[in-house]
Design a protein with these regions (language model features):
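Secretory targeting and sorting signals
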Residues: 1-24
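Predominantly soluble domains enriched in secretory-pathway, periplasmic, or organellar proteins
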Residues: 23-397
Length: 397
């Protein structure tokens, strides 16, 4: 087992930092006054970009690591070792893993990757309200509850999803997951959280058996208890549940495509193998970015088209859900590293983060073409559609 894995396994301890209390806004938001925006987490530059969904103009960005040096200085020796090892595994600094806006559009919640914490910011005042360290050494994907009171984040090396009170930053509960939990999503009705795990990505493909459980975990959002689990044959990468509540689409580690999975039957019912680009053909599986051939999956608003992001292929494939047939491809320059897909609020566009190009590509589901490309910060990854209070936009840089 790699030295990094041994140290991390031995050093996983409870390291949650008590956060200062901050009262949550109790006033109901004036939803009609809020503005539809796309949040883009710029992982290396430690900022979140705001893109206007009406016209795709950049509205600016917000610095979410104003306390970077302080946070590093606060680390004890074990935490600092974990930070450096995780930084190596991630391929460098990764300060923004995920982000969400509060229902009133005035607070920004951020999962801060290699800092292994979650922070809340008052946008208007440009003030950090609290930060809370998670168990383990890396804060991963996150999801905000529909009512805005809970922010659930994957504590990657601790193999748990931790639920945070957004008013105070306190960790109120956690749920066990598979090995190296990754994505979190609330169900459409808000009753459940679905967490998926990817396994230890530092191990080579030949040791896939040692990567741990590749598990989809269904958690009751009210009790924060696990109600059901499913095991898949490979690490579960970007995924989504169709409106029928049973059809699960997922990209898997090493698969140049995705699978369709029946949750009720507990089995894969279809596998879509996508074409390799010329550059991708030269890569060995152990050279895929953290085991991912494809890393980004979204569904059009009408449910007719999947946006399958070909990370090693430098393209996006638009795939019909009826028959799982490729309908169109949008190709990017070699080395663009498309790394996430997110459907627009109106359901008509797929936003694709181009991590190495420092931009977001806007793809029209209906025409199968790129209609805009928006410059953002350094190494964009996660994108989230949100609503912001226009009054706070003046705080953006």
């Amino acid at each position: 087992m790699p030295t990094a894995r041994i140290i991390l396994a031995a050093a996983v301890v409870a390291t949650t930092v008590a956060a200062p209390a901050a009262s949550a806004s109790t006033a109901a938001p004036n939803v009609t006054a809020l503005k539809n925006v796309l949040l883009v987490g710029n992982s290396q530059s430690g900022s979140v970009s705001f893109i206007d969904e009406n016209g795709f103009a950049s509205l600016g960005s917000f610095n979410v690591i104003p306390d970077l040096q302080q946070r590093i200085n606060e680390m004890d020796p074990i935490q600092r070792i974990g930070y450096e090892i995780t930084k190596g595994i991630e391929g460098g600094d990764r300060f923004v893993d995920d982000a969400s806006l509060s229902p009133d559009g005035r607070r920004l919640y951020v999962s801060r990757g290699n800092l292994d914490d979650v922070a809340a910011f008052d946008l208007a005042g440009k003030q950090e309200l609290w930060h809370t360290r998670l168990d383990g050494f890396h804060a991963d994907h996150a999801a905000l509850s529909p009512d805005g009171t809970r922010f659930v984040v994957s504590a990657t090396t601790a193999n748990k999803a931790e639920f945070i009170d957004t008013a105070t930053g306190a960790i109120v509960s956690s749920a066990p997951t598979g090995n190296y939990p990754h994505q979190n999503d609330y169900s459409a009705d808000g009753k459940y959280v679905y967490n998926s795990s990817i396994g230890d990505v530092s191990l080579p493909q030949s040791l896939e058996w040692a990567k741990g459980a590749f598990q989809l975990t269904k958690i009751d959002a009210a009790t924060m208890q696990v109600v059901k689990t499913w095991t898949l044959p490979h690490g579960i990468r970007p995924n989504l549940i169709a409106p029928d509540g049973n059809t699960f689409y997922a990209e898997l580690s090493y698969l140049n495509g995705f699978v369709k999975y029946d949750l009720n039957a507990g089995k894969i019912v279809a596998t879509v193998n996508q074409p390799f680009s010329e550059q991708a053909k030269t890569l060995k599986p152990d050279n895929y970015p953290k085991n991912s051939a494809h890393h980004g999956l979204a569904l059009s608003g009408d449910g007719s088209t999947l946006c399958d992001v070909g990370t090693i292929d430098d393209y996006v494939a638009l795939v019909s859900t009826d028959g799982l047939v490729d309908r169109a491809f949008v190709n990017y320059p070699t080395g663009s590293l498309p790394y996430w897909g997110q459907t627009s609020a109106n359901g008509n566009y797929c936003y694709v983060s181009l991590s190495q190009a420092n931009a977001v590509s806007v793809v029209d589901y209906h025409t199968g073409t790129e209609v805009a490309r928006v410059p953002v910060g350094t190494f964009p990854q996660r994108e989230r559609v949100s609503k912001v209070d226009p009054a706070v936009l003046g705080s953006l840089s």
